[in-house]
């Protein structure tokens, strides 16, 4: 096929032409390229190609915000040919092009394969999320359970082992998967390093640090700590002087993004009077439309935006985030403080990117950034067709990273993509009910972790075989064809134990006593053991081996064989473990589900049937259902219980608790808390109920205004809206899973109480 070098007025790069050629040839494809290089253009070409036929295509993304953005983009181009399905949002679910989160696609592939039987292509955006500790399993299961007829377009940031990823996908779907790896950026990056209030090239930083290492690299350097408080001002001022704005300033804390944005706006001003008037009108319109007059966040953000400064993170209301995105895209904002989700969820590059720190909290502990994370965020620097160079400002903070660690992070190799496969109870139940035992074994062998482990299997197999041969070679062979060597060795070990015991006691006497007493005790010990020893010597003569001149040689060879046998057992165990990594985990979870009454030898019991349809806290939801809480509680109480199931308390983000309000919780909610928390003490995989925020849901469900809700808590507005929308998702899961019409109708009412006003208005924004 002859291809034009332009698509939608864009001149295609060579890697894009290669990718489109592979698509036209009907191949699946792994496309690895730097952030901002134009991978999405290939996906858009594929969607347009499929929409010209009667086939269907599914586009998956890692986060709802990105799904919503893609839905808005594609629906503007293709109208009602596009739909979206993200759990809490369902629009035109049977559309020819369906935009979904990866979790939704995985659920369809496992539970309702008929729904995707006519899908010809699936696009996996950000497939490197497969290496995410919390969510990576979803990507693997999505690929494993996809129809064999489907073709994949897997888009990834730069990863070194994309060939290995492609070979694994190829082994799962049984057809060829091509690889295109493009490492050249459309706009090259240049790194600057912040140190001692100035920006340096790397070679100059090296001289500076080595010249004053003793002065500046102490772990508790007070000067560094004070410098950190004003780091953002120094960086912004110098980039402004060098005409390197707009700037995306990345921080790993929402609270810090809020603080730095407001501080900067109160000390710096980047906008003209005309820009201020326009920004003010846009913000006022947003505040009026969504009734945000009394929200401190909205008023502070207005002050910041009017001076050309902003912030963007998940704690902001989606309506305010959208306003920030519009102003940044129009180049009205010069400095934007963002968290790392901006690098994934929003395709908005800038001339410069800066980091406030290089350590992050990952939900478990503080750790240095990984090279892949650093590369993806840094990739937001440099706008194609606008900038000749993208600038990345990296702080040198010795208490966080040594100079060598800093050098490796910026200039070192990116980590390989590693599998994080871990079966959920939902997956175990669906495997158990839908497949025979041997089929399950085969499925469990198809994950990426097993594929990576299989690389070692030939080496392990060879090692085991060599050890077996070596044991056979050294094992004693009696030239006299005597048959009592095994019995003799049991006797020999008993004799050795007695002699060892005697030796230890003699040693204790020698080191513990001196003079005449020592000699007396020594004589007593010798007498104590002499009789036993004489008896053993007599027994030794009864063995043919005991009288043989080859005895010492046979004993030596036997001991050598025993040592080799220990090695063999170790490597054989490792080989068995590597050969079926997931089967033991699957069997342990099956046994637990059997004890809990979810399965029997025939299949799923009623509890298992329900849990197999729930993807959020499935065991807790199932137990609440079978103990009558969804039936007996009011709609408002059901909503509050669901919120307590899904809410994740964030560090330093507020807990939402009002002691008096929490104490007034309805008895049914207190009862549910006691019930689930009792289960959680028995089973660590069950999360205790977070009831400190239940009063917020009850008030909202009963019709309170959002401003009144926010006056009751310190939880960020965006977090609370997102939690409410997650409850909507969970309620829909439960409604689809239960059979009683009366309960289904009740859950529909629950949804209506939540999905109103500002929560409804965020449906396609968050």
Show where each model-derived region lies.
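Non-catalytic terminal extensions of ATP-dependent helicases
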Residues: 310, 329-333, 412-766
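Conserved nucleic-acid-binding Ia/Ib motif block in the N-terminal RecA-like helicase ATPase lobe
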Residues: 55-100, 104-107, 167
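Conserved segment of the helicase C-terminal RecA-like domain
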Residues: 348, 352-362, 367-408
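SF2 helicase catalytic motif II
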Residues: 104, 112-153
